[in-house]
Amino acid sequence: MTSPLTPADQLIIALDGMERAEALAFISKLPEVSWVKVGLELFVSAGPEVLADLREQGLQIFLDLKFHDIPATIAGACRRAASFGAELITVHACAGRAALAEAQAAACEGAAEVGLSAPRLLAVTVLTSWDQKRLANELCIPQSLQARVEWLAELAAESGLGGCVCSPWEVSGLRRLHPSPFELVTPGIRPSGAELADQVRVMSPAAALNAGASRLVIGRPITRAVDPAEAFARCCLEIEQRQLD
């Protein structure tokens, strides 16, 4: 039987807006953190070497590059990304069934070639900065946002992926359709009192987990806090209290 995840295992700290040295210095002050997210900005500025640096600190990596291209290109990118040791890697669900299936197979091959465990690929559904009105007006998508996310998550599951990325607003409906171990990783997490910034579909850590989220991605409320360690501890406490209720 799988042991329940600890609060630290359920929180992924997004190292967005940081250079390599800043990211490494920041995370070294948070020894309780287990997971970090490396996104496009940090990866483009620092390269794959930053992943090795973070792994040396014992951290697990959510490599959030949101690959979206033709199947062969996505597969090649996922093969290389898996060889860097990331545990979670994102691809856009809109890339389609062939691209998702080939990406999953390539990631397994890339990890095996360097003696690593296969990563879990996550399909990005609809970004948390989008709302229903923009989806219709800018992309001409007539589906409701919930229906769109559920359709893309089903595509990911049918393609053999291990989970998807969605806002916390869609988690409850998705969890009914896709029981664990299908992972639902949710950005748009805002503890009580935190600013929304450019996120639209947001929720508190406890509420998102109660809805069925597997892991939570949280950035600015911790990385820009006056005391990041204390902010992280507060999030963990909120999760612990939820587990006791």
UniProtKB/Swiss-Prot annotation:
Keywords: Decarboxylase, Lyase, Pyrimidine biosynthesis
EC number per UniProt: 4.1.1.23
Signal sequence range: none
GO CC annotations, alphabetized: cytosol
Gene Ontology biological-process annotations: 'de novo' pyrimidine nucleobase biosynthetic process; 'de novo' UMP biosynthetic process
Active site: K66 (proton donor)
Entry GO MF terms: orotidine-5'-phosphate decarboxylase activity
Reaction(s) the record says it catalyses: orotidine 5'-phosphate + H(+) = UMP + CO2
Oligomer status and interactors: Homodimer.
Family to which the UniProt record says this protein belongs: Belongs to the OMP decarboxylase family. Type 1 subfamily.
Protein name: Orotidine 5'-phosphate decarboxylase
Organism for this UniProt entry: Prochlorococcus marinus (strain MIT 9313)
